[in-house]
């Protein structure tokens, strides 16, 4: 029996409502593979993004919590606990690697090759950068370096298209600037470049805020607020590095909200 595209989309929406995101991913993977040389609709594209974002987000949160506990146990000298925690962290890292490999293959094999508009190209290249960045968050040594290089290439390719094809107020262009700046700050340890990129994107969007359409006003202004929040946080940390240490356990950066 042939798998029906509309049925898969419906089941993905149902899975989203039930907060069963692993199943939502599976349904949207079917859709992406069904379309062959066609492009996903904006709705399908957003469903795919939301599905993977939730699946990866839960594991990223777990990894951060486990890593924080590991550091505390190390500081106490509880070597036996540390060994158990490291083993458990490896399980989460394997899950993270598998999820990232899944979406990156889908992007390279189906989604990026069929993208025909500037908007969809930026969307998928940004997504590619995001999932390589998630790998760079927990990988070490040569693997981390490779993930960071792939992230930079994807974000730069997306940025080149966004600067030409999308207005400064476009939520996808703003989301790209937000996540690219987080990459500079968190992975490349370059707060100056992170702040420059975030400030430039914010200032360019503010200058054209009057021309912003009603349909994207909410998304665009939300991401602009996130850019400003990061700028405030990063600037204060650069002026007083010790301030960042006082926020133990807090997420030190914010990323874009999905549609």
UniProtKB/Swiss-Prot annotation:
Name the Pfam families for this protein.
14-3-3
Locate the region Disordered.
Answer: 238-259
PROSITE patterns, per the entry: 1433_1, 1433_2
Q: Which residues cross the membrane?
A: none
Gene3D superfamilies membership: 14-3-3 domain
Report biased composition (Basic and acidic residues) as residue ranges.
Answer: 244-259
Where are the annotated coiled coils located?
none
According to the UniProt record, which cysteines are disulfide-bonded? Answer: none
Record SUPFAM superfamilies: 14-3-3 protein (SSF48445)
As for family, the record states: Belongs to the 14-3-3 family.
Q: What is this protein called?
A: 14-3-3-like protein
Question: What broad taxonomic lineage does this protein's source fall under?
Answer: Eukaryota, Viridiplantae, Chlorophyta, core chlorophytes, Chlorophyceae
